[in-house]
Amino acid sequence: GAGSGCHTLALQEMGKEVTAIDISPLSVEAMNKRGVKDARLQNFFDKSLTGPFDTILLLMNGSGIIGKQENLPAFFHRLKEVLARDGQLLLDSSDLSYLFEDEDGNLDIAPEDDYFGEIDFRMQYKSIKGDSFDWLYIDFNTLNLYARQAGFKAEKIEEGEHYDYLARITHL
C-alpha cells in the first residue's frame, strides 16, 4: 500500500491528483496527518476501488501484494478493471533466483517446490508479533509471461544492482 504516503505527497506537490490506498488503519491515519488528500483504507483487490486510473504505482517491492504466483491471473484481471486503456502500472520487484544458484550458476530448484519468490512474512517488534502473510517477489520473465497471457505488455525500464528492477505494464 501507500504506507506513510511519501510518494503520494511528492506527487501531490507536483499537482497530481492521487488516490492512496493501504490496508493498515495506522498507515491511513499517518497519511491523513501528513496531508494526503485522498487516503483510503482499502485493498487493491476490493471491488469498491474503481478506476480508471492512468497510473498505478506498486513500489518498494510492490509485487508483494500479489502474495503467491497462483494469484497472478486474478491480479491481472483486477488490473484490467481499474487501469485506464492508455494507462500504466509501474511495479518494482526483486528476482530471488540468485539465492538458489549452485556454484556453476544453475538454479537448484526442484520442480515440485513452490515458486522461489513466494515468501511467508511475519513482522515482530520486541514481544509484539503480527500475523504471517504471503509476499511475492517476482522475476521479470515470469511477470512478463503472466502479463502477456492476460493481454498486457511488460517492459523492464530500469535494472538495479541487487537483482531488482522496475517494470512498466500497459494494455496490449
Language-model regions: role of each:
Residues M31-N32:
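Conserved SAM-binding loop
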Residues S4-G15:
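Conserved SAM-binding loop of SAM-dependent methyltransferases across substrates and taxa
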